[in-house]
From Swiss-Prot:
Main location: cytoplasm
Keyword Metal-binding part of the UniProt annotation: yes
Keyword Membrane attached: no
Protein name according to UniProt: ATP-dependent 6-phosphofructokinase 2
Species: Nostoc sp. (strain PCC 7120 / SAG 25.82 / UTEX 2576)
Highest taxon, organism lineage: Bacteria
Cofactor(s) this protein requires: Mg(2+)
Length: 357
């Protein structure tokens, strides 16, 4: 009997989602002659029983080709709302759509919610990791991360020249509330002088001392500071600055650091803040993200054909392999290892990455 599978994108968007959709539709159609339904706007579309036949109505194999270099997701996505408040509706929708299996492309939050729904409804679920934060456990790589790193590095390349021209300290705030993979990778690749991440606490004195040393010892009158939005102060500094008019929670991590540098230097150091924001989520997917998305999409279809459900496609040791979704959810988010090779490499290059423990 011909299978009917569904596919949805959930959570924040990122480059490479359309590449996954392209791979799933192409492989499912060419190899297995399955029907593929795209479910718009994640669990909202599932609850409302919306579905788009991706191998019909203009989405033939020739028409899918442009998806390879298209950012965002043609299916739309949401990252808000209380999904579990509509459990019964969504459980009924899976049956009403007559799905034999569902492919979910999401981050750790989405995977947790969809895994819970699948467990309650006995769905046949296969997951694909996507996140610019790269914080999904048990996989070395997630769709969207590489492009986001490249986007930040491009911004750092541009900002370095304007910082040098004006002898400024440029603070670049990037995404990463609980994990600093994005800031760490982009900061090292982009030649940052300071990288602040959630996993390693920093002090105002340590930060200011490092910038002063760049000027006094190395005659570097400019500096590039990359800070994750979830970077954490040491406890002593938190207590001292809790009443500050520009605490991180009030005006943003980047602006807070700029104000502290100005205060330490008695306003002798000129600072500027650049919050990259959602530009990190956009753009044409990189070659690596296209390859990752394609292999992940193909592997997800094969897992369905093999009857291997409750699995997420992961990248480990150069191969795409299945790992149990429940293990991924239990071990996520994946944090930066403070003693890992990336942190140690950054420190050996003279980059301030917070205080050593």
């Amino acid at each position: 009997m011909r299978k009917r599978i569904g596919i949805l994108t959930s959570g924040g968007d990122c480059p490479g989602l359309n590449c996954v959709i392209r791979a799933v539709v192409s492989h499912a159609t060419l190899t297995y002659d399955w029907e593929v339904l795209g479910i718009p706007y994640a669990t909202q579309g599932l609850r409302e029983r919306q579905a788009i036949a991706l191998n019909m109505h203009g989405w033939d194999l020739r028409g899918i080709d442009p998806l390879l270099n298209m950012g965002g997701t043609i299916l739309g996505t949401i990252n808000k709302g209380d999904t579990l408040a509509h459990v019964d509706e969504m459980l009924a929708s899976y049956q009403a759509l007559a799905l034999d299996a569902l492919i979910v492309i999401g981050g750790d939050g989405s995977l947790g919610i969809l895994h819970e729904l699948a467990s309650r409804g006995n769905w046949n679920l296969v997951a694909i990791p996507k996140t610019i934060d790269n914080d999904v456990a048990l996989t070395e790589r997630a769709v969207g991360f590489d492009t986001a790193v490249n986007t930040i590095v491009d911004a750092l390349n541009r900002l370095t020249f304007t910082a040098a021209s004006h002898d400024r300290v440029m603070i670049v705030e990037v995404m990463g509330r609980s994990a600093g993979h994005l800031a760490l990778h982009a900061g090292i690749a982009g030649g940052a002088d300071v990288i602040l991440i959630p996993e390693i606490s920093y002090t105002i004195s340590g930060l200011c001392q490092h910038i002063a040393e760049l000027r006094d010892r190395w005659q570097r009158k400019f500096a590039i500071v990359v800070v994750a939005e979830g970077a954490k102060l040491c406890l002593e500094d938190v207590q001292e600055n809790i009443a500050s008019s520009c605490a991180p929670s009030k005006c943003g991590r980047g602006q807070y650091i700029a104000d502290q540098i100005a205060q330490c230097s008695k306003n002798l150091i000129d600072t500027r803040v650049s919050v990259l924001g959602h530009i990190q989520r956009g753009g044409i997917p990189s070659a690596l993200d296209r390859l990752t998305a394609t292999v992940f999409g193909k592997t997800a279809v094969d897992l369905i054909a093999q009857g291997k459900f409750g699995q997420m496609v992961a990248w480990q040791n150069g191969e795409a392999i299945p790992v149990p979704i429940q293990d991924v959810v239990a071990q996520s988010p994946l944090h930066v290892n403070p003693q890992g090779s990336l942190v140690q490499s950054a420190r050996c290059l003279g980059i301030y990455v917070g205080e050593k423990t």
